[in-house]
Amino acid sequence: DILRIEEIKRLMKSGVSVGKVKGLLENKEVMTQGNWASIQEEMMTVLRYASPAKLRAKIGEFRRDHAMDALIDNIISPVRQRMNQDQNTVRHMASLLDGVLIEFAVASLAESRKKAGKDALLIGWECDDRTHLWLEAARLAQKGWHIDVLADPIDSPRPELFPGQRIFVWTGKAPTPRQQELLDHWREQGFVVSFHH
């Protein structure tokens, strides 16, 4: 029962509607890899229409039905990976998706500012995927943070330029030993810097 209560709290906190939470709990539907694959295929089908409005609507539908973590990890990221690996995929479609995803992330950031929360800065560190950086900002926003984003990833973050601010750094992978050493050094200097993964 405690696990069930925790699941309800997690779903509600992540923004899943009350009706959807009730439906998920009544059905006790467990999302399997096959379920995620069919949802990913739905998104690929909508992408083929090359319609930003249809794509925004589908992402909005998925957002109402799934927690932000699940949406990013099980739908958006796999679809983006498929598009980047598919030699037949037109770069225009991948770029269209990224544009809609950034718009989605920015809307999530704006929505989070309407609620109580703490301010933080998100910095991409030695990473190339700007779109995923914005998705990670949306993920943090769903966890109650008011996130500001440095739009361009930085090779060498300088927390001293942002005194007194809470800083999250994101690399898209586990920190290297050098990055971990720098994180520890910054913390020793009194900066509030966390690795976001």
For each feature predicted by the language model, list its residue ranges.
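Generic helix N-cap/helix-start motif at coil->alpha-helix transitions
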Residues: N35-A37
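Helix-enriched interaction subdomains in cytosolic or periplasmic regions
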Residues: S51-V106
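C-terminal regulatory/effector modules of DNA-binding transcriptional regulators
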Residues: E103-H197
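Basic, Lys/Arg-rich alpha-helical nucleic-acid-recognition elements, primarily the DNA-binding modules
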Residues: D1-Q33
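Amphipathic alpha-helical repeat scaffolds
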Residues: K9, Q40-R48
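Residue-level detector of family-conserved "landmark" positions at structurally sensitive sites
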Residues: G19-V21, D73, L150, H196
